[in-house]
Swiss-Prot record:
Record-annotated membrane-spanning stretches: 169-189
Protein name: Major intrinsically disordered NOTCH2-binding receptor 1-like
Modified residues (Phosphoserine): 79
Highest taxon of the lineage: Eukaryota
Gene of this entry: MINAR2
Gene Ontology biological process terms, A to Z: angiogenesis; cholesterol homeostasis; exploration behavior; gene expression; homeostasis of number of cells within a tissue; inner ear auditory receptor cell differentiation; inner ear receptor cell stereocilium organization; neuron apoptotic process
Annotated organism of origin: Homo sapiens
One annotated Gene Ontology cellular component of this protein: endoplasmic reticulum
Length: 190
């Protein structure tokens, strides 16, 4: 296999990652499909950027995106139309800038106490978890789901019912046999 035809063959950290600076849309079919979008006045060359290109270039792209976007225009060359925003957010290459900034801010100011962690964390019940006793078995099995565990419990309950009925039947059989022997002995001696 000739590796020179692959994109980014001279950077092993970027191996087989998308390196597309711009894609020229020259097809009349693609131009016609762009007209259907709201605000369909797209330029002939649309620029696509891969947000997950490499760790060090990620911040540069985000800074360019912040500088390049304006609050007045709803649709720019860098942002998708409003109808595509839900599709973009489901895309694994989509990076929300507010989440990334919040994560960087949390890394700059770490929480050293439980109260601070509860204030700044998404998981606000850390103090409740610390009150639980790890020696208690329910602490370890609390939220765990084992596939087939409910079926196993039903099977054990069915076996317990079956053994209970068997014991009752055996006790009833013993009582009846004792009564029969007592009646036969009494009839012999009378």
């Amino acid at each position: 296999m000739d590796l020179s035809v692959l994109p980014n063959n001279n950077h092993p950290d970027k191996f087989l990652q998308l390196d597309v600076k711009s894609l020229t849309r020259s097809s009349a079919l693609l131009q016609a499909s762009l007209v259907r979008f709201p605000g369909g006045n797209y330029p002939a060359a649309q620029h696509w950027q891969n947000l997950v290109y490499s760790q060090r270039e990620k911040k540069n792209i985000a800074a360019q995106r912040i500088r390049g976007s304006s609050a007045d225009s709803l649709v720019t060359a860098d942002s998708p139309p409003p109808s595509m925003s839900s599709v973009m957010k489901n895309n694994p290459l989509y990076g929300d800038l507010s989440l990334e900034e919040a994560m960087e801010e949390r890394k700059k100011n770490p929480s050293w106490t439980i109260e601070e962690y509860d204030k700044h964390s998404l998981h606000t019940n850390l103090s409740g978890h610390l009150k639980e006793n790890p020696n208690d078995l329910r602490f370890w099995l609390g939220d765990m789901y084992t596939p087939g565990f409910d079926t196993l419990l039903k099977k054990e309950e069915k076996q317990e019912k079956h053994s209970k009925f068997c014991r009752m039947g055996l006790i009833l059989l013993v009582v009846i046999s004792i009564l029969v022997t007592i009646v036969t002995i009494i009839t012999f001696f009378t």
